[in-house]
Amino acid sequence: MLYFLAGYFAELEFLKSIYLRTFLAFVVSFCIVLFAGKPFIKYLKVKKFGEEIRDDGPSSHFSKKGTPTMGGVLIIAAVLLTSLLINDLANRLILLVLISMLMFAAIGFIDDYRKFTVSKKGLAGKKKLLFQATIGLMIWAYLYYIGLTGRPMIDFSLINPISAHPYYIGAIGMFILIQIVLMGTSNAVNITDGLDGLAIMPMIICSTILGVVAYFTGHTELSSHLHLFYTVGSGELSVFLAAVTGAGLGFLWYNCYPAQIFMGDTGSLTVGGILGVIGIILKQELLLPILGFIFVLEALSVILQVGSFKLRGKRIFKMAPIHHHFELMNIPESKVTLRFWIATLIFGIIALGTIKMRGIL
């Protein structure tokens, strides 16, 4: 809305500045979550939307029973309102990301709501994957019919994150890749969201770094210098990601140990999906596993645990996801969380480093 008004009033021309709007997006979304947090938590308590705790989980988690969940609604609402207020809504990429976000949010919300009204298992896993695949189909259709970079050979290529060399995989290959990326990021963040503040801070770090990459990709000179594939309008995604970062930081205020609220699937599936969608738009599909190393580690620990038990009848870890394994090794929850944050920051710096290394190797 502000961007729209700036086009009609010369006095508001300064509102078109991407730097100013990025700052405003961060502040506005942060304040929305911060000030709406307390009444929202009270509302969830009244409605008795509280977390259920696994009986076989660490004993320290039993005290978390009844902690309000579905906090992702607050994050999504803040990002949506901020984006509608500050983003350039004529930008196709912003509209694509907003639609994707709402679709992921719908999956998560239905899953959370069913846990309280129908079954503790929530939405069936196959249905979740089917709905996520539908979002993937929409993203693929955008690439196929509209395109990103204006070069189909690049749009349907996998980009080496270090050398920037494109590997053409075709439309079918890209369809498969998109499904893997979206299902992977969305569900990996969901798996990680098992300790107070564990998932939200890595998400903040990832969205911040992706915001920097989005700005570089949407800048003609910087994208050329850094061997990124220039995409018209992608710089606007840095404003959107600033809103995600601000909302995440505001949520961390209430989600840090001891948590007053949890994201629930509404939040974790959505923020993971957002990272995946924007990674695809920026042609950074292979940068995502580096940037989101902790999410990959958590997801792999579950896959290995299940696979090992089915094939050998033995477990690799004391409990999966791996953050529970560390807890059962008597490492305090807060220490596990902080170490995972540190690891995410390190891999985030490495991910940024690969951008700078492009063209050297």
Residue ranges and their predicted role:
Residues 2-41, 79-106, 139, 145-160, ...:
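Alpha-helical transmembrane segments
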Residues 35-56:
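Membrane-interface helix-loop junction between the first two transmembrane segments
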Residues 44, 113-121, 260:
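Membrane-interfacial helix termini and the short, flexible loops that connect transmembrane helices
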Residues 52-69, 92-93, 211, 221-225:
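Alpha-helical transmembrane segments and immediately membrane-proximal extracytoplasmic
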Residues 54-67, 119-128, 323, 328:
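Juxtamembrane helix-capping/reentrant segments at transmembrane boundaries
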Residues 64-76, 127-135, 333-343:
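Select subsegments of transmembrane alpha-helices in polytopic membrane proteins
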Residues 90-98, 117-131:
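Membrane-interfacial loop-to-helix junctions in multi-pass inner-membrane proteins
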Residues 115-124, 156-167:
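Membrane interface segments of multi-pass transport proteins and intramembrane proteases
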